[in-house]
């Protein structure tokens, strides 16, 4: 083997392996201290890009879960208020039935009306004050809002809430009353047919035909109407006037009356009536109030059902988001996180190689000194 002084190849080789071992140890220490095996693009450019996308998706999923929980909270606040509104309407219905009884005097009906008015005011107060984060929920201003329940744009769910004020059309309907009352001696003669045509809430054209019998009185006619249709409700006031009420929850638009009996009864024009207009100081008003409140209860129940479905949907959405997020983070971990068992093994190897390279380098540096012995 040649002995050189100017070029110590053995030392250079040992130095190269020493540097390589030092770099390996430094990289292992970086991975072990950071917890990530990809700390820069030079470690794994493709893996870093995939990891960043997965991280963005995971953060989006976390925010989507928060949004969904906020949506559930809004629905719970609104439904709680609707529950109390339902209790108020049911109490108003009880009072209407009580006032419709013939055992009550005018003064007693006026007293009942005072409670009905107070309940109506509370119904409106609940509608006006129920809010979430400053947003009114039940006074008609909420409208339709979207809830982002996905990690990407376009993954939104819409929630609509209408007004629960007692003066809205959803809390009432149209009332039709005979222009003239029938006394107790009135009965159906040879004109026995009454037809009612309307469009129901589902958009279907309906025609209700009442076949009365000669000798039937006005109360029996109201019974026939109620027995053949859930969409319209009939009652008779103390003045003998037949009145028909069609809730906006059952009927779209107006009811048209025809048939030879319709002419004899003589229905007047449609009149818009809501819970706000309830007047239980008369038998006729009390009976109509029951029909009006039934429609209002259906309106509230319909909104509550929508909120219940909304909450259930969001609960399932949250479960799905959590499952997706778990798998996304697991994938990201496999790509980016440090395998401590593997990395500690690699660091130990680098440390041993570094120590060995250092020892060999020290010996290699002594090789040129052999030339001095030849000169001696």
Curated annotation (Swiss-Prot):
Keywords: Bacterial flagellum, Coiled coil, Secreted. Its main location: secreted. Disulfide bonds: none annotated. It holds the Pfam family Flagellin_IN. Belongs to the bacterial flagellin family. Heteromer of multiple flagellin subunits including FlaA, FlaB/D, FlaC, FlaE and FlaF. V.parahaemolyticus possesses two flagellar systems: a single polar flagellum propels the bacterium in liquid (swimming), while multiple lateral (peritrichous) flagella move the bacterium over surfaces (swarming). The polar flagellum is synthesized constitutively but lateral flagella are produced only under conditions in which the polar flagellum is not functional. This is Polar flagellin A. The gene is flaA.
